[in-house]
């Protein structure tokens, strides 16, 4: 229920304590009702909150002892579904026992019988140990990966990039670049720059105009070279 919450959250911790404490008393009342019905005992709140009710020399006292021990088993399942952390089970078990001790102290005074203390400590240990075992098994359960497999099998469409049309980025175009360059050598880009002194330079790029990464051959003709070619 609260497994995904790992950060310190006082409201969450208080909610867990109250939930476990309420379930502890609800389950204890239900167990006492069943046992009292079986052994013809009278159900009362004194069985829960008076330390004198737990004793070994009367049938009602033994019924209350049995009810507290059985309730510790059910309390461990409360830890499994509410706490869900094995390292926190002992803390919550001790908290439940301490709160019950405070309530009993307020209702009937400070507990003075060894039997009451023994039953409470044994119940706390049972609740903590079984709760840790159940929570540990839940923590070690395999995570279902069916949804992850479905997501992995979904095809992902990647929009084409403007650079994919480049011959260097595209292996098919790159393999045909050499053959296409021989057929497109007639595409010549010329740029003439006239200087202020009347001399001019002509830059001719010969290559594949469709391949921007093709090596460019430069031919620089000065004004004197052009005059020599004209005389020849």
From Swiss-Prot:
It is a multi-pass membrane protein. It comes from the Eukaryota. Keywords: Golgi apparatus, Membrane, Protein transport, Transmembrane, Transmembrane helix, Transport. It holds the Pfam family SYS1. InterPro entries: Integral_membrane_SYS1-rel. Residues 220-232 have a biased composition (Basic and acidic residues). Belongs to the SYS1 family. This is Protein SYS1 homolog. The lineage of its organism: Eukaryota, Amoebozoa, Evosea, Eumycetozoa, Dictyostelia.
């Amino acid at each position: 229920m609260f497994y995904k919450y790992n950060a310190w959250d006082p409201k969450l911790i208080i909610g867990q304590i109250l939930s476990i404490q309420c379930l502890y008393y609800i389950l204890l009342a239900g167990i006492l009702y069943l046992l009292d019905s079986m052994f013809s005992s009278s159900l009362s709140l004194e069985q829960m909150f008076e330390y004198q009710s737990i004793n070994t020399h009367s049938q009602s006292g033994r019924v209350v002892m049995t009810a507290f021990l059985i309730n510790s088993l059910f309390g461990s399942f409360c830890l499994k579904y509410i706490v869900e952390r094995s390292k926190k089970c002992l803390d919550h078990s001790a908290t439940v026992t301490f709160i019950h001790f405070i309530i009993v102290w307020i209702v009937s005074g400070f507990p003075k019988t060894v039997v009451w203390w023994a039953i409470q400590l044994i119940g706390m240990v049972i609740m903590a140990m079984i709760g840790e075992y159940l929570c540990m098994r839940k923590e070690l359960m395999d995570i279902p990966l069916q949804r992850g497999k479905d997501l992995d099998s979904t095809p992902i469409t990647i929009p084409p990039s403007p650079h994919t049309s480049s011959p260097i980025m595209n292996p098919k175009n790159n393999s045909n670049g050499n053959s296409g360059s021989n057929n497109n050598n007639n595409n010549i880009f010329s740029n003439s720059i006239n200087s202020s002194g009347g001399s001019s330079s002509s830059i001719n790029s010969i290559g594949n105009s469709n391949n921007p990464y093709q090596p460019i051959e430069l031919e620089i003709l000065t004004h004197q070279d052009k005059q020599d070619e004209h005389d020849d």
